[in-house]
Amino acid sequence: MLSQIAICIWVESTAILQDCQRALSADRYQLQVCESGEMLLEYAQTHRDQIDCLILVAANPSFRAVVQQLCFEGVVVPAIVVGDRDSEDPDEPAKEQLYHSAELHLGIHQLEQLPYQVDAALAEFLRLAPVETMADHIMLMGANHDPELSSQQRDLAQRLQERLGYLGVYYKRDPDRFLRNLPAYESQKLHQAMQTSYREIVLSYFSPNSNLNQSIDNFVNMAFFADVPVTKVVEIHMELMDEFAKKLRVEGRSEDILLDYRLTLIDVIAHLCEMYRRSIPRET
């Protein structure tokens, strides 16, 4: 049986909170909701050893100031940043590091992915710890990096490994979240989420200045932690290409352009293979 994951959510929108609670309703998650930046800072200071993962909504007031204060106070934990306050579309995932170098980004419309992205955030933090924080950039790009903070991060990583059973991210995957073990309704929801995520990858694949890498990472995280077979990924790709082909035929245009998107499929599968490679525990 997997240990509970303690998640602290800083959210000031009732609608977003409800979406988060719906996605993380399983007994596996213990949620602490902070309705303001002040509440978050107070809770993080008094319960820093009881937070496994932070979910931070970028549209919250004083977001950057609060996150900066977390860094300066040495509260650096696995994190997911939702939305992007500096974008023309604040619902989209952020395009830059806002808290630390191991944070993951989700759009507000992608919150159904949270069960898989929480696992991914924990795994990424453990892989990169000690991570570079926003405070490091402020202090001359890390020239004055606090060694005590690095030590605290390593201690947190060790605590997570011991309590949650991380030897490699493969061993942390929750079998109850595997595609083959999901109830029919949940399986359909996952399939739809992956279709939507893959569509975003395809539509932005050849666009400059897109958030492509984050989109691919989000899709691969879902595929990996749900133990989705590569054949299913290929199926999702082919379904989308068939849909696009029908539209092109209706418009009287050539379907040859779709051949270029074979690169998209190869890229996504390569990322998934890399995720599996990294999951193999290092020999001791």
UniProtKB/Swiss-Prot annotation:
Effect on the protein upon substituting residue 119 to E: Extends the period of the circadian rhythm to 30 hours
Source organism: Synechococcus elongatus (strain ATCC 33912 / PCC 7942 / FACHB-805)
Something else known: 'Kai' means 'cycle' in Japanese.
A single MF term (Gene Ontology): identical protein binding
SMART domains: KaiA
Outcome of swapping residue 117 to L: Extends the period of the circadian rhythm to 26 hours
Protein's recorded name: Circadian clock oscillator protein KaiA
Gene Ontology BP terms: circadian rhythm; detection of redox state; entrainment of circadian clock; positive regulation of circadian rhythm
Pfam families: KaiA (PF07688), KaiA_N (PF21714)
Domain KaiA C-terminal: 174-282
Null mutant phenotype: Not essential for growth on low light, loss of circadian cycle and rhythmicity.
